[in-house]
Amino acid sequence: MKTFIRIAEIWVPTEDRTELRYHDGLYGTHDEFRALSQQMRFKYNEGLPGKAWATGHPVIFRELEDSNFKRTEAAKAVGLTCGVALPVVADDVLKAVVVLLCGDGNVGAGALELWHNDPSKFFELRLVDGYYGPAVMFELNSRHTGFPRGYGLPGRAWKSNMPLIVNDLNDSRVFLRWKEALDIGVNRGLGIPYLHPSGRTWVMTFLSARNTPIARRFEIWVPTQDRETLIFHAGDCDQNSEFATAYKSAKIEKNDGAIGQAWASGIATARASLAHEKSVVAQSAAAAGLSAMLEQIQVDFTHSLHA
């Protein structure tokens, strides 16, 4: 079973902060696309990474044939259809941009959504843009839906200012569009809030379909009160629903494995292989048959995607 996210990339500013350069990534078998990416640079507001740098919030390209996307032909050759860029910011300074490039094969598509609240103009979250694949009616419904603070997956992530994982979107108390989601096979969701210095809020939602899950596992780790270690907060895995029991007493220190390195550096980390990763997270993932992981850090939490 293929995941909806096919390629993950990490871009970081050059020393003079005039461009973004390639840092690391997960490409599976797409070595030619990796080689092309390693040669590229993105200026401020250029391409998908540069747009996220310029805006300071997530950006969706619902079509990679968009003239703003700089690797159109290469993306088409490996079946990529859409992408999202997630800025990693600390103290108003860009540390990295994580780019997720997706392909659904037009079967059982998942969805990517970007929601926005501007308190000077409206009280709820409104859809900025989204990718829905063949789910036309679900897209239409979403474009005419708003979420007050605390309501639905986007609204609850906004209220808590924490990522929210929902492993059963059939629960109408959590996911207000559950009937439409059921019709297209979407059954899991992840919401990630992004607070902007302007006071505006963006929420990125990943809706996972049974046939093409966004990723095989999501994990959220948060700092302890003394901020000396990270502890497990929430997660979901389609390979082992009981995986969290192994984390009950687990603590991750800075530089301990991929998550600890992301926390220490403030930059996302990628692991194309878990063979030499000794952390409790990597061992749990490997035991579930997962082979790669991406860690992204934000101020008060890290979140992990596994394939």
Residue ranges with predicted function:
Residues 1-7, 107-112, 119, 213-218:
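Sensory modules in modular signal-transduction proteins
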Residues 2, 40-43, 66, 74-80, ...:
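Short loop/turn motifs at secondary-structure junctions and domain boundaries
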Residues 7, 49, 72, 85, ...:
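Short hydrophobic/aromatic beta-strand element in the GNAT-like acyltransferase core
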Residues 8-16, 23, 113-121, 126-128, ...:
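Short hydrophobic alpha-helical segments used for membrane anchoring or interfacial signaling
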Residues 34, 41, 101-109, 139, ...:
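Regulatory loop-to-helix N-cap segments in sensory/regulatory domains
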Residues 81-89, 188-195, 291-299:
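A short, aliphatic-rich beta-strand micro-motif
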Residues 89-94, 106, 195-200, 227, ...:
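Flexible loop/coil segments at beta-strand boundaries within sensory signal-transduction domains
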